[in-house]
A protein has these predicted regions:
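Histidine-centered copper-binding motifs that mark active-site loops
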Residues: 1-120
Length: 120
C-alpha cells in the first residue's frame, strides 16, 4: 500500500529529475506466514526498467527494510533516460510475491523530452 492506496499513485518525472521515496515497513504478517517464511515481514523497493544506480540509497535491491523501520530511496533519473512507463515494486528475494499479492506496486512514468523518438 502506498499513501494508503492500492495500487499506489502514478509518479511522473522528467529525465534529469530526482525521485525520493520513503518506504516505511508496516507489514502485518501473520504468525503462520512467519513460520513458513521467517523473512516475510522484510521488504525493499526496486524501480523496474530504470537506468539508475543500484548503489547506496538508489535502486539497491540488496537492502532489507525490517518491520517497523524506514528507508529513503533516491532515484536520480539520468538526463538521457528513455521515456516510458516503469513500475516500482518490492524486490526482496523470498518475499516479493507476498508483497505484490498485497498490492505493493505503483507506476512511474518518465516523460519524453523534445528529442525523444519513442513517440509517446
Amino acid at each position: 500500500m502506498y499513501n494508503e492506496q492500492t495500487p499506489g499513485p502514478v509518479i511522473v518525472a522528467d529525465p534529469g529529475d530526482t525521485i525520493r521515496v520513503k518506504l516505511k515497513n508496516n507489514l502485518d504478517v501473520e504468525a503462520q506466514t512467519k513460520q513458513w517464511n521467517p523473512q516475510a515481514d522484510r521488504t525493499n523497493l526496486h524501480l523496474h526498467g530504470s537506468h539508475v544506480t543500484p548503489k547506496g540509497r538508489g535502486d539497491n535491491v540488496m537492502i532489507a527494510v525490517e518491520n517497523g523501520d524506514s528507508q529513503e530511496y533516491i532515484y536520480q533519473i539520468p538526463e538521457n533516460h528513455p521515456s516510458g512507463l516503469l513500475w516500482m515494486h518490492p524486490h526482496l528475494h523470498g518475499t516479493t510475491s507476498l508483497s505484490l499479492a498485497g498490492g505493493a506496486a505503483l507506476p512511474v512514468f518518465i516523460l519524453p523530452d523534445e528529442k525523444d523518438t519513442n513517440n509517446l
